[in-house]
């Protein structure tokens, strides 16, 4: 029988879910934020990173981000098939779930699960509350803005100010003059806009509200940026759970607008939803493609600190798509025992090395791989996971 890995502690209080966009520091010891390491340090990290699981039939529990969930499912399936015992059974079982980033953060921080998957990193205050927790970058993803306008065939240009006014109820019709000004020559319907947002605590909400605040700080306050927020009271607005719910809800509601993770691109296309081109920090309008996501990430990944808490929202990157992020594993450095720690280290190491293959894993969910400098930072953090 598989043994379930548990953390070495439980916390009485739930983690605050006001995850902020600014890069934050950890109270835990960490290597230099430059991402470089000495040969001796690299050797120490390498010796702490097993490349295969133990043989004690452990079970690792993971839940959280619905944006990361499709990739995590592919990763865990491949990992369990690669590492098997003489009877053909997996050496380690990995249980995954799509509950939203906020739940993943909370459950990992309070010891309910081993790995919390999140599109958002822990805020500095959360890191002070839970100093043993780490934000480990696993891949680079992005977020779409989708809409249900069957008569509009040209991708609509939108910016943070217009989106803010839609989600605060100031713009209520698709043929509003502010939208028309961004889209000259496009025939916009006299149709009521139905803003759709997440009902669950979500990293996608963190990303979306971060973009609104970055482009229109007077219209969308930084105090209303997070995984779980107080949405303005907008007539007709709807809420759905998970990215899957957002796709289904938007597809069923003519006039809807929604923010949906890039890993659901094939589903939004199959549902016939339009995809906006968004204004970036350089004043350009870009769609989320491999090239534009990479352009945004490349402008910032070199600034990733040792604890990997970095916002890539609305950078001043030419050709960059403005809603890009790291996908994180939120993990405690203090596991129940050495075997548990070894198995978690081995799986996460596999994710940031073998799991970075575009052909085998990332391309199917429209994610981008970590640059080698960030892989080194993730390795450094993974190596800290112990008992």
Predicted regions and their residues:
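Flexible loop/hinge segments at secondary-structure junctions
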Residues: 2, 25-387
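C-terminal motif of bacterial Sec signal peptides marking the signal peptidase cleavage site
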Residues: 18-23
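Bacterial N-terminal signal peptides that target proteins for export
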Residues: 1-12
């Amino acid at each position: 029988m598989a043994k379930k890995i548990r953390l070495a502690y439980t916390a009485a209080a739930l983690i605050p879910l006001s995850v902020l966009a600014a890069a934050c520091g950890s109270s835990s010891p960490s290597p230099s934020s430059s991402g470089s390491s000495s040969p001796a340090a690299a050797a120490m990290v390498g010796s702490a990173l097993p490349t295969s699981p133990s043989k004690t039939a452990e079970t690792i529990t993971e839940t959280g981000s619905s944006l990361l969930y499709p990739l995590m499912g592919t990763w865990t399936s491949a990992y369990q098939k690669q590492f098997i015992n003489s009877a053909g059974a997996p050496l380690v079982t990995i249980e995954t779930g799509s509950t939203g980033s906020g739940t993943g953060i909370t459950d990992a921080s309070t010891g309910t699960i081993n790995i919390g998957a999140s599109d958002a990193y822990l805020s500095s205050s959360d890191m002070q509350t839970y100093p043993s927790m780490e934000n480990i970058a696993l891949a680079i993803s992005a977020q779409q803005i989708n809409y249900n306008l069957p008569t509009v065939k040209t991708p609509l240009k939108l910016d943070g100010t217009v989106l803010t006014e839609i989600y605060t109820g100031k713009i209520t019709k698709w043929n509003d003059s502010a939208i028309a000004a961004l889209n000259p020559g496009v025939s916009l319907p006299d149709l009521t806009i139905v803003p759709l947002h997440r009902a669950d605590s979500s990293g996608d909400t963190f990303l979306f509200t971060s973009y609104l605040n970055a482009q229109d700080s007077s219209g969308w306050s930084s105090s209303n940026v997070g995984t779980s927020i107080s949405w303005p009271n907008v007539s007709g607005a709807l809420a759905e759970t998970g990215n899957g719910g957002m796709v289904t809800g938007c597809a069923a509601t003519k006039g809807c607008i929604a923010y949906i993770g890039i890993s659901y691109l094939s589903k939004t296309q199959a549902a016939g939803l339009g995809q906006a081109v968004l204004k970036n920090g350089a004043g350009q309008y870009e769609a989320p493609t491999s090239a534009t996501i990479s352009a945004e990430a490349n402008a910032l990944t070199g600034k990733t600190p040792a604890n990997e808490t970095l916002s890539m929202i609305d950078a001043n990157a030419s050709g960059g798509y403005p809603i890009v992020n790291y996908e994180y594993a939120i993990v405690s450095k203090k596991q129940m025992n050495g075997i548990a720690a070894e198995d978690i280290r081995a799986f996460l190491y596999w994710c940031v090395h073998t799991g970075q293959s575009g052909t085998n894993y990332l391309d199917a969910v429209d994610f981008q791989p970590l640059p080698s400098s960030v892989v080194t930072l993730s390795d450094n953090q993974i190596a800290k996971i112990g008992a």
